């Protein structure tokens, strides 16, 4: 079976991505088994769609470094126009290559970066779940959409979130997971959050975040700005 360890097909990991039956918050034995199988696939050669899909899978497995490696591989220029299972990459016009051309890798790449920065399945917003801390030490993202009809902006430095802004558009429950967030969040009424378990917090101590209500966390995990 060793010859299949790095095979591009990964349908046995559908429960990890795009579905969410397998997660770190669920059965940890199953999660670790999925992670082990995924890492055995490696970060090397593959088709465009497979490279894009593995970025998303590694994001769900919280493997930021492997996401980074796969992104670099997916953005490697290729000139092949023949069917080639080892020539995934991009053409000069930034179209994804299987090879030949397919759009799956382009969509998978962008979806994967979003998954690295924000995940919102299983009833919570997970902030920077797969940040490649040695490479993406500083950055910002605006306008990410989360399940529950939230809009999220994140700014980070030294590989730690500095500011998190969340806007609710539907008045649904808002639960955020990020180490240190419990002490640093204010809602529009300047009230602190109530900590549930030190990592997952009901923002503002409320069961639901009212429509249009904004939450702001400054200096997350450090000093409040």
PLM segments and residue spans:
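Extended glycan-interaction surfaces of carbohydrate-active proteins
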Residues: 1-48, 71-91
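Well-ordered alpha-helical scaffold segments within catalytic/enzyme domains
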Residues: 14-26, 40, 53-62, 112-121
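Aromatic- and histidine-enriched alpha-helix N-cap/loop-to-helix transition segments
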Residues: 9-14, 45-52, 62, 101-108
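Non-catalytic C-terminal accessory modules of carbohydrate-active enzymes
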Residues: 65-198, 204-210, 214-224
């Amino acid at each position: 079976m060793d010859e299949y360890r790095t095979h591009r097909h990964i349908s046995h990991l559908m429960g990890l991505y795009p579905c969410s039956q397998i997660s770190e918050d669920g059965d940890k034995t199953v999660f670790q088994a999925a992670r082990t199988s995924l890492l055995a696939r490696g970060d090397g050669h593959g088709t465009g769609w497979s490279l894009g899909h593995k970025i998303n899978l590694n994001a769900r497995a919280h493997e930021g470094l492997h996401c980074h490696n796969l992104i670099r591989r997916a953005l490697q220029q290729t000139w092949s126009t023949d069917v080639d299972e080892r020539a995934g990459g991009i053409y000069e016009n930034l179209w994804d290559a299987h090879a030949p051309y397919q759009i799956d890798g382009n969509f998978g790449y962008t979806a994967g970066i979003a998954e690295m920065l924000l995940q919102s399945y299983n009833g919570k917003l997970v902030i920077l779940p797969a940040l490649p801390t040695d490479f993406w030490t500083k950055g910002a993202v605006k306008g990410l959409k989360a399940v529950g009809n939230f809009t999220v902006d994140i700014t980070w430095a030294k590989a730690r979130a500095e500011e998190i802004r969340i806007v609710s558009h539907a008045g649904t429950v808002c639960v955020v997971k990020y180490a240190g967030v419990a002490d640093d969040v204010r809602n529009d009424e300047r009230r602190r959050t109530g900590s549930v378990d030190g990592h997952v917090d009901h923002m503002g101590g409320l069961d639901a975040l009212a429509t249009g209500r904004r939450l702001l966390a400054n200096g997350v995990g450090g000093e409040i700005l």
